[in-house]
Amino acid sequence: MKRPDYRTLQALDAVIRERGFERAAQKLCITQSAVSQRIKQLENMFGQPLLVRTVPPRPTEQGQKLLALLRQVELLEEEWLGDEQTGSTPLLLSLAVNADSLATWLLPALAPVLADSPIRLNLQVEDETRTQERLRRGEVVGAVSIQHQALPSCLVDKLGALDYLFVASKPFAERYFPNGVTRSSLLKAPAVAFDHLDDMHQAFLQQNFDLPPGSVPCHIVNSSEAFVQLARQGTTCCMIPHLQIEQELESGELINLTPGLLQRRMLYWHRFAPESRMMRKVTDALLEYGHKVLRQD
């Protein structure tokens, strides 16, 4: 059975995290040649490439498995060493989260853990349809995802759902939808997406108004908070979580353009098994808070 040297695994991890050999060498305080040698040792041990040497480098499928193993070992080391030895160096927890969770419920959920535990968060923002892939690749130790099925050697629990409403400012609605939201009026109304892979708006329009993808003008803005600002200032109509705009809806600053219609995204919490003590704290905090503020039906 092949047992990797975790020092060499850390070199592979550093190349991926630092997006190159030079910065990985600086991070590890060794030469760039030494980084290359350690990775070559690993590749010789497993008889296959572990890195695709692109810019930036990315792990092969076997490399992903080894990085996932390293994440688990690091967390279990924290479990075994105990508070006395780990308290002086905060534990790094890399989590993949969607932008809307980060903008609404995630940080309040983690507040008790951050206040009581010596950890450093590395929150990697990704669409909820793709966060699980980061866990699969070993880039993170936990992920908020819409996928309900656990990966091999992982655990999953239901968090609850975010309900998305189709909203805009009153002046925007008067300009683009004077006779209500119709298929023809939607073709002229500017919308917004998080990135080119974000299909929330398009899926809603296709499902409820039979509009094919790509048929409406759409801005690309990588910020959940900016969606709210764009809607408030009358620039776009948007799909925004109800949880994020409760005050704006109550005050009338934003209006629900399609009462009775919404887009529901059920969220799940994925992480490696077995859980370390610290990850168990994170899990408990996320589930407790998520079950309070997210839809459970």
Swiss-Prot record:
Residues 21-40 bind DNA. InterPro entries: ArgP (IPR017685), ArgP_gammaproteobact (IPR023490), LTTR (IPR050176), LysR_subst-bd (IPR005119), Tscrpt_reg_HTH_LysR (IPR000847), WH-like_DNA-bd_sf (IPR036388), WH_DNA-bd_sf (IPR036390). Keywords: DNA-binding, Transcription, Transcription regulation. It comes from the Bacteria. The keyword Transcription regulation applies. Coiled coil: none annotated. One of its GO terms (molecular function) is DNA binding. Residues 4-60 form the HTH lysR-type domain. Belongs to the LysR transcriptional regulatory family. Homodimer. Controls the transcription of genes involved in arginine and lysine metabolism. PANTHER family: HTH-TYPE TRANSCRIPTIONAL REGULATOR ARGP, TRANSCRIPTIONAL REGULATOR. This is HTH-type transcriptional regulator ArgP. It comes from Salmonella arizonae (strain ATCC BAA-731 / CDC346-86 / RSK2980). The gene is argP.
